[in-house]
Amino acid sequence: MYFKYFWILCGFWVGLGAFAYGSFKAGPLIKQGLYTRPEVNRYLAGFLICTLIPCLSFWLVQQTGSDIEHPFFMEWPDPQRSIAIGLLVFFWLSLATWVFALKGATPLSKTITLIANAPASLINPSRVKAFVAIMLVFGVASLVVQGM
């Protein structure tokens, strides 16, 4: 039963969990002058929305197939499988465009600093760009290996 709702639960768990953790972690960072409260709210709300939209999209596609009981969209029947892959590629292209062409690496690195349990010195825009590039390469490779 939980697999039927995996995508929506994942979106809320990751999105709201990160929002709560980031809000808690932000206090000392605000006191140090590294962030303002409006910045924190904007970054965390953006992360919440950017987590919920893909998860909600996959969940809605999953719900259109009456017999789809699991979240593994590479195993879904067509047309749900093709729609999910199309959405995945769209979200990847959106992320890549934002990070590489629209200077999204800086706000993303600031958001990751709020929600990650890592020293802020390890998170910077260059490393975010590298991570996104690696993620995209491995994501595309996994689609190819699984027989997109």
Predicted regions and their residues:
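Short alpha-helical packing/oligomerization segments
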Residues: Y2-I8, F12, H70-T111
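N-terminal signal-anchor/start-transfer transmembrane helix
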Residues: Y2-K31
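Membrane-helix interface motif
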Residues: G22-G27, L56-F73, L102-S109, G147-M148
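Membrane-interfacial, low-structure loops and terminal tails that flank and connect transmembrane helices
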Residues: P28-N41, P107-L122
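Loop-to-transmembrane boundary segments
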Residues: E39-C50, A118-V137
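Juxtamembrane boundary at the C-terminal end of a transmembrane helix
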Residues: F138-M148
